[in-house]
């Protein structure tokens, strides 16, 4: 799952020195433990989440503005509560704005519904696809931060029919893939084929000449885009 970035206003329940506040914010960078809030859509089990950065921006009386980059599934309102507990004054989330999800950044990716309506009408009149590309991105953009495996053309159609990826079909791959990681499988041209779960690490995958290396979880490419190079069992 893609990491996220937020800008948050945290309300302190009493005043604290700014130096003390900055020090505590730095303590929350890295791996933290979180139990989801009472009002949440998941079971309230203690779990770990990664805070990639937590940057202080400004403080106005008891209102603290900060930017946080975090692993998906991190509850910012719980983060504010925990910061307040460590400070000893208590705190809660006052305002929250998400500014990034994976490769999609607020300043670069957002369009209004009015923009979409206008551009769609323009496309209907002109049939100029470049107009749509102003707000419709190829799905590969959403996958660009995921670990990737590139495959031979001969393996593409089999995967499009739900087959698992075997070692002979692999051309190249990103380093650092671990067992159980979700990976994006691409053609040599950079077209997304499937999302898959790695059976082995990238180091072992490079040494294999046969056997399954990744389990297909979601097919992204329609069947028949590449020639069929496999045979069905009779």
Predicted regions and their residues:
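Short flexible coil/turn linkers enriched for glycine and charged/polar residues
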Residues: 2-3, 47-48, 59-62
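Ser/Thr-glycine-rich phosphate-binding loops at phosphate-binding pockets of nucleotides
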Residues: 69-78
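Nucleotide/phosphate-binding catalytic cleft detector across ATP-hydrolyzing
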Residues: 30-34, 47
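A generic structural motif
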Residues: 64-68
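A short secondary-structure junction signal
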Residues: 19-22, 36, 77-82
């Amino acid at each position: 799952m893609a990491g996220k970035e937020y800008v948050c206003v945290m309300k302190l329940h009493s005043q604290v020195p700014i130096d003390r506040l900055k020090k505590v914010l730095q303590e929350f960078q890295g791996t933290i433990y979180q139990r989801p809030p009472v009002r949440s859509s998941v079971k309230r089990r203690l779990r770990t989440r990664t805070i990639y950065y937590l940057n202080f921006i400004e403080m106005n009386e008891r209102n603290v503005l900060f930017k946080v980059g975090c692993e998906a599934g991190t509850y910012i309102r719980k983060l504010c509560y925990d910061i307040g507990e460590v400070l000893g004054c208590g705190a809660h989330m006052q305002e929250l704005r998400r500014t990034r999800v994976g490769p999609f950044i607020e300043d670069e990716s957002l369009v209004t519904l009015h923009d979409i309506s206008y551009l769609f009408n323009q496309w209907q009149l002109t049939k100029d696809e470049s107009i749509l590309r102003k707000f419709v991105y190829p799905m590969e953009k959403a996958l660009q931060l995921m670990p990737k495996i590139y495959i031979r053309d001969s393996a593409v159609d089999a995967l499009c029919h739900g087959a698992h990826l075997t070692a002979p079909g692999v051309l190249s791959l990103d380093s650092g893939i671990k067992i159980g990681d979700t990976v994006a499988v691409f053609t040599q041209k950079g077209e997304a084929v499937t999302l898959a779960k790695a059976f082995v690490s990238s180091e072992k995958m490079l040494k294999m000449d046969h056997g399954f290396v990744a389990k297909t979880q979601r097919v992204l490419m329609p069947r028949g885009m590449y020639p069929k190079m496999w045979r069905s069992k009779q």
